[in-house]
Amino acid sequence: GYDIRRDADRIKRRVGYMTQRFSLYQDLSVRENLEFVARLYGVRDPRGAARDMIKRLGLTGREEQLAGELSGGWKQRLALGACTLPNPQLLLLDEPTAGVDPKARREFWNEIHALAAEGLTVLVSTHYMDEAERCHEIAYIAYGHLLAHGTVDDVIAKSALTTYTVTGDDLNALAIELTGKPGVDMVAPFGTSLHVSGRDKSALEAAIAPYRDRQGLHWQHSEPSLEDVFIELMSRAKDNFQ
């Protein structure tokens, strides 16, 4: 390991960091940005390294395009190329796909998985649960406190949530009636359905019993999703900024 005070410079050379906001030079081309980063880190043959990265990330044909003229998805791809150009051992990504379209998000994550398969350790912050599910391990942090960690399956299992999915008529009124009842820890709309969850199964079932036979409603026991767990954990988190 490295001492963060004594070995700060050595650590920096082994860590790649991609900011949420695009931070490369808007008035330089794709190639110029990558060559600049390569020279900054002392990479041998900066031109060759930039050329290889352009090919890897599918940026061929855009080499001379100004970075500021790229779409959000292409900018993120360029930023990923820049922070992995020096071959770091650890890659830090701060909400890397915020504001990026679904297709670009999927392509970006495919590249992240390819890098991880090559041995790169990647630490990602994200508020998209579908992205969290792509990770080997996850951690929930709220207001500076670690609420849960482990694999996705571990985190869901440890939550001990019992969840019902409700479909039918006037779900908004049902949500208002159930919110705050003893045993009901979470009520959240999901598309055309409602998720009702609680950690105490007996208390939850007692709370929803009067509504189970209500005309126009269909109740089904379901496995809690990662988003169910996230919402429930956040509802219990103490806001220490208030």
Stretches with model-predicted labels:
Residues 91-94:
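Catalytic Walker B motif of ABC-type/P-loop ATPase nucleotide-binding domains
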Residues 27, 66-70:
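Conserved ABC ATPase signature
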Residues 87:
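Conserved catalytic motifs of ABC-family nucleotide-binding domains
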Residues 80-81:
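Hydrophobic anchor residue at the start of the ABC signature
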Residues 108-199:
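ABC transporter nucleotide-binding domain
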Residues 35, 39-62:
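Conserved ABC ATPase "signature" region
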Residues 197-242:
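C-terminal coupling/interaction segments
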